[in-house]
Amino acid sequence: MRQAPGETIAEPARRIPVYGHCDVLVAGGGPAGLGAAVAAAREGADVVLLERYGHLGGLSTGGLVFWIDRMTDWQGRLVVGGIGRELLDRCGRDAVLGPPPELWGAQEKEAVAYWHIRASAHRGVVTWAPTVDPELLKCVANDLVREAGVRVLFHCWAVAAIAEDGQVRGVICESKEGRFAVLAKVTVDCTGDGDIFAAAGAEFESDVEEATIHARVNTSFRFGNVDLARYLDFRLHQPQEHATLMRQAVAAGVELRVHATPYDSVALFMTPKFSGYSAIKVADLTAVEFRSRDAMRAGLAWFRAHVPGFERAWILDTASQIGVRHSRRLVGVERVTLSRWKAGGRSPDSIGLCPGLTPEFPTLEIPYGCLVPRRLEGLLAAGRNLSCDPQAHNPLREVPECWVMGQGAGVAAALAVRQAVPPRRVPVPALQATLRQQGAIVGA
C-alpha cells in the first residue's frame, strides 16, 4: 500500500438516524463498563451499554487477562467488594483458583510458596489474586446485565461523541446496520482508550515511561492438554532447575511465563510483552498481533521439548482482544499521583480502594474527581483511562480497580440523572452511601 500522508477526502454531510434515548449510556463493556452499566441500572436508570465485541468483560474475558490482581491488601483485608466481588462469587469455586479467605495475608513459608506459583502470593504475602474461567465470567456478566435491565448492544463501535457547547449528549456508533446515534443524559466512557472523551475534546495525557510494563502490548494465549499439576510440582520442588530452564528459554528467544488456571489441563500466557508500540495506531496493533502469534508457536515447540508437563501441549486459543495496558488518560478535576499515594492516599471523595503497590505503600482511596473531566459536562470516564500520572497508572489499570471505578461512575451517573445535576455536582456523601448500599468498599 502506498502511504498518503496529508491527503484527505471530503465526507458528504448526511442525516444520522437516532437509535434511541436513555438516561445513561456506557461505551465499552469491559470491567469498568460492566460495573458502570449494572450499578446505574440498579439505581433505576435507563441504561444502554455499547460493546464492539460479542461479549462482556473486555480484557478480563476476551483479552484472556483473567488473573484478577488483587482483591485484598497486604494485610489480607478485602479491599474490592461490590460488583467485582459479586462476579467472582457467582462464578463459583470450581471456576476460580485462589487461596481461601483464612489464608489472605498469610506469611507462612509453605503457604507463600504454594500460592506464589499460582500467582496469589507476592513479596512474601498470600493475597487474593485469583484466576477465573473467562468463558464462565462472560456468562455471569450476561446474567448481571439482564437482571439489572441493561439494554446491551453488541457488535457496534462507539466512534464519535455528540457534543454541543461543552455538553456531551451521546455517541455515534458504527455497526453492520450502518451508522446511528444513541442519545443520553450522561455518557460514561469505558472504552479503555478514552475514545469518547478524546473525540469530545476533553484534555488528556498519553505519556508513559517506556521501561515500565504499562508501556507494553501483547496478545495473550492458552495451551491445552497440559499436565499443570506436574509442571507446578516441578516449579515448587525444583526451583533452581526451573529457573535455569527459564533462563535457557530466554536465551533461545522464548520469553513465556506460565500462569496457572482453574483447570489442570490449561496454562495461560500473558507474555511476551512488546514495547515501542502505540495502542491507538492500527499498524502497531497489527504488528503486535503477528509477533504474539509467532512467539506462541515458537514457545509451544520449546515448551514441548523441554518443560515438564508440556510434552503433549497444544494451542487452545488466542485472545480475541489485544492486551493494551495504556493509551490515553483523562485530565480530570483530580489526578492520582504517586507522590500523593505515598503520602497516605486518602481522598474525601473516595469511591473505592486500590491496594498498595508494595507492602510499604498504603491502600489508595480512589477519588471520584479522577473520573470527571476538567471541563466537559454530561460525561464521566472510568477504567484505565482515568486521570492519573504515569507512575500511579500501573496498579490502577488492573481489573479489580476497573470494576471499582466503573461502579462508582455508574452510581454517579444515575444520581446525576435522578437529581438533574451535572455529574460533577453529584453530592459525594450520597454517592458514597449508595455505593456502600451496593456492597462497595469505599474507604480504607
Predicted regions and their residues:
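Core beta-strand elements of the Rossmann-like FAD/NAD(P) dinucleotide-binding domain
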Residues: G20-C22, E177-V186
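Flavin (primarily FAD) binding-site architecture
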Residues: D189-E203
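Conserved beta-strand-loop-beta-strand element in the redox core of flavoprotein oxidoreductases
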Residues: I162-A181
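Extreme N-terminal leader/targeting segments of oxidoreductases
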Residues: M1-V24
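N-terminal Rossmann-like FAD-binding beta1-loop-alpha1 element of flavoenzymes
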Residues: V24-V47
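Short hydrophobic core segments
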Residues: A27, V182-G192
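Mobile, glycine/GP-rich and aromatic-enriched active-site lid/loop segments adjacent to catalytic centers
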Residues: L103-T131, E135-C139, E147, D207-A382, ...
